[in-house]
Amino acid sequence: MPRVKRGVQARARHKKVLKQAKGYYGARSRVYRVAFQAVTKAGQYAYRDRRNKKRVFRQLWIARINAAARQNGLSYSRFINGLKKASIEIDRKILADIAVFDKVAFAALVAKANAAL
């Protein structure tokens, strides 16, 4: 069996990792062994935070809706309950947007939700 040195594949693999580590500080962008660890950890963080992002944004929307609903004299839970009873199906992302940018329309939604309770 002939000896296999894998020089080309190793160089390609190292280049790929170092390209992904571009912009990292110090040895993390220059030394393969350190860069590999940094890129691997970055991938783990990215994977985890793609899932966390959904939770964080939902929390933000709920906080904004709650604040706007309370300004109109209704708690978040009663507001959502009223919307469901009035069969108004607007998701929390859009409700939060309306609460921030169109206070008149949000006040109308609160009135409808209050009437349905």
UniProtKB/Swiss-Prot annotation:
Q: Which UniProt keywords apply?
A: Ribonucleoprotein, Ribosomal protein, RNA-binding, rRNA-binding
Q: Does the keyword Manganese apply?
A: no
Q: Name one GO biological process term.
A: translation
Query: Got a GO cellular component term for this one?
Result: ribosome
The record ties this protein, via Gene3D superfamilies, to: 6.10.160.10, Ribosomal protein L20
- InterPro entries listed in its UniProt record: Ribosomal_bL20 (IPR005813), RIBOSOMAL_L20_CS (IPR049946), Ribosomal_protein_bL20_C (IPR035566)
Family assignment?
Answer: Belongs to the bacterial ribosomal protein bL20 family.
Q: NCBIfam families under this entry?
A: rplT_bact
Record-given protein name = Large ribosomal subunit protein bL20
The organism is: Aliivibrio salmonicida (strain LFI1238)
